[in-house]
Amino acid sequence: MSGRNNNKLPSNLPQLQNLIKRDPPAYVEEFLQQYNHYKSNMEIFKLQPNKPSKELAELVMFMAQIGQCYPEHLSNFPQELKDLLSYNHTVLDPDLRMTFCKALILLRNKNLINPSSLLELFFELLRCHDKLLRKTLYTHIVTDIKNINAKHKNNKVNVVLQNFMYTMLRDSNATAAKMSLDVMIELYRRNIWNDAKTVNVITTACFSKITKILVAALTFFLGKDEEEKQDSDSESEDDGPTARDLLVQYATGKKGSKNKKKLEKAMKVLKKQKKKKKPEVFNFSAIHLIHDPQDFAEKLLKQLESCKERFEVKMMLMNLISRLVGIHELFLFNFYPFVQRFLQPHQREVTKILLFAAQASHHLVPPEIIQSLLVTVANNFVTDKNSGEVMTVGINAIKEITARCPLAMTEELLQDLAQYKTHKDKNVMMSARTLIHLFRTLNPQMLQKKFRGKPTEASIEARIQEYGELDAKDYIPGAEVLELEKGENTEDDEDGWESASLSEEEEEDGEWVDVHHSSDEEQQAIATKLDSMPMEERKAKAAAISTSRVLTQDDFQKIRMAQMKKEMDAAPGKAQKRKYLEIDSDEESRGELLSLRDIERLHKKPKSDKETRLATAMAGRTDRKEFVRKKTKINPFSSSTNKEKKKQKNFMMMRYSQNVRSKSARSFRDKQLALRDALLKKRKRMK
């Protein structure tokens, strides 16, 4: 009977659904029967929308599954569900509300609903106190917008949704506003909505009175999540074979040099494709897309001065302001005195505050404003009453500030800090040396003569520009090296012809001809010519090359290497003996933001205290096996033997026994035999 009942189509919706999908015209009557049943159930439900209805939920999902089969009959079905959700979403049963949303998502996936109206409805449903529903809607919104912009940017839909989200961010419901912000941030990170409008909508969230929204917006601009995801090798969205697929294919196939070469080639191609697919990212690109960074930074500073949030939130605000000022080179003079109040060694997170002060420094800030900041750091940190670590942090901070704003450093302060080169603490000494080395490249004339080092071409050319001065050159510095290299190549060609003719003559005699043309000798010849050439002639040659030809990437690389060579020649000590070093061309360029390591850098590792050393030692023993052999009983529930009882017996009960009294009176021979037996027994046990 049960099998027969299962074949009854009106009561078995999954079977009917399967048959309709196979042949829709053949089952129109059965569909209309269910559709009328659905309409009657819907009318009853509208009278009491707060009551659950399992039958209605099944019918709604059935209609959604076959929506594409009868579009003329179900043309009003999506709108009915949307109206029901928009008017009654607060009173609906959670399970039924989830079913209606899933039905709409199913219809949207079949492209039977307009995306704009549906997404607006889903944003309104984010106000519901249903965590599972909010998570489902969030996933669908992100995926749907990604699919809309998959082939090309659909600006028409994007503009409508962005405007709607802008209103949602100002919504009184904190949950809905936070979810809307999360959607925008996720879409920006996936490079779907990576335009300036999205970024400037997110900037409004930085002034929200709701802490969660404020922190989410600040975290986005500070780029913490980008840094975490930057090094991930695989993404769920990437199509095509992965490195694992290629390795499995090689492991299961025939081994051989030919297949190995194929694998290596495939891995190279895969790596190249991944690089192409990877979006071009520069440091914290969202900050670069802000329309009016000056006004934004001023508003943030005003908010920071009256902020009553936790200390961590204040630190995030300070960090964002300092990044804005440093990257956009803004004028925010009130920020420096505000930061100056916190520059005390006992201040919580003082190294981060020093980092913010360094980030906010740039060459357009008047030097007198940064000078007061430098003096505060020097007076509070770089004094003998402080520990070596505090002094090191202070000198490192001064070095980073002056690297960005060299005019702020006075000659008197620099000479005082240079005296710490001979300090007893190694960290302080090395930090002072790095500061001296910085000014050897920036302006050696500010240092005392003994600290300037050997004068070289790079140090002679070094000069700090005056405040507001522009150093506009009509040539590419260092381009004269290309002219000299060209001359060397022509000479080499002539020598080559001569050596070739000589070798032809001497081949008959059977003698070898030694030809000496190494890259080191060429470098040496070019460097010698450069040294002998006056400065005016160099500039003229560089200007002639810059205006007469189009430079290639190789030419720029040669110029860069030559400029780096000048700085390498200025290095003291052992590097001076080896003049013609091979310079690493892959040197990493310095980013536009500082890291905390630049401030906290200690050249000598501090000693660990007893607790730290003990914790490290105990952590190393976790995986160590015990070397004592445990005695195992055949029956673990059996009682202890007489021998074990004897060992555990109280001595006061044993002191008058014959064994104890005779043990002390044993002869040397008895002791010798007892020792032998014990050793033999121990050896057996070790086996």
Curated annotation (Swiss-Prot):
GO (cellular component) term, any one: nucleolus
Keywords: Coiled coil, Nucleus, Phosphoprotein, Protein transport, Ribosome biogenesis, Transport
Parts forming coiled coils: 254-315
Modified residues (Phosphoserine): S232, S234, S236, S585, S589, S595
Subcellular location(s) of the protein: Nucleus, Nucleolus
InterPro entries according to UniProt: ARM-type_fold, Sda1, SDA1_C, SDA1_MD, SDA1_N
PTM-bearing positions, type Phosphothreonine: T552
Residue stretches of biased makeup (Acidic residues): 490-509
UniProt keyword Magnesium, yes or no: no
Residue span of region Disordered: 484-509, 604-651
Signal peptide region: none
UniProt similarity note: Belongs to the SDA1 family.
Role description: Required for 60S pre-ribosomal subunits export to the cytoplasm.
Record's protein name: Protein SDA1 homolog
Top-level taxonomy: Eukaryota, Metazoa, Chordata, Craniata, Vertebrata
